[in-house]
Amino acid sequence: MRFHGRLLTAFALPNGLGHHRFGITASRKAVGNAVERNRTKRLLRETFRLSGDALGTLETKYDWVLNAKAALLKVKLESSLEDFQTIVGQAAALEKRSNSQGARK
């Protein structure tokens, strides 16, 4: 599944484990030099760490890959957290919709 946010793009695949895992990409083309890439990676790591409650609402555990966008450099942690939690909400809605369709068959 792919989800687009204002500050990041997230890819999620079910992993069959009892916990979520995540990876980060922050390319020089998309974000900038090493200092900027490292800052975006720190922001995304902290965003994922603080999103534990939102991720707990998902029945399925996923492998997440978060792709940083250049706009992430211009915002505070709260904006990044809000954007990712919106994405998790979209994933939960998609999961709920697919579960309800599976129950009808």
State each model region's role.
Residues 1-105:
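Positively charged, solvent-exposed patches that mediate nucleic-acid binding
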